[in-house]
Amino acid sequence: MAPVADTTPEVAHSARVVVITRDGCHLCNEALTIVETVCGQSGTEWLAVDVDADETLRSTYTDHVPVTFVDGREFSVWVLDADRLRAALT
């Protein structure tokens, strides 16, 4: 059996928490507020990335934003739970 290709975007490894987002997306704004609060409380590095700034991200995630990655792995799509994120960072 051939190995499965890693489809995780390179940007997901840019910080401990990465949120792929888009301007004008209300769910993105909610996710960013949660990430800013939870990461601020724990001192965790995080990064927001605009899905429309990169063709590869746009083609993969355009219908799924916000997408949150923790430690380089997809953690949530659309709705981010603050308690679940907090637990993942401890």
Give, region by region, the residue ranges found by the protein language model.
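A short, hydrophobic beta-strand/beta-hairpin element that forms part of a small beta-sheet core
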Residues: 65-74
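Thioredoxin-like thiol-disulfide oxidoreductase module
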Residues: 45-64
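Conserved helix-turn-beta segment immediately C-terminal to the redox Cys motif
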Residues: 32-49
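Generic recognition of short, well-ordered alpha-helical segments
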Residues: 30-33, 60-63, 80
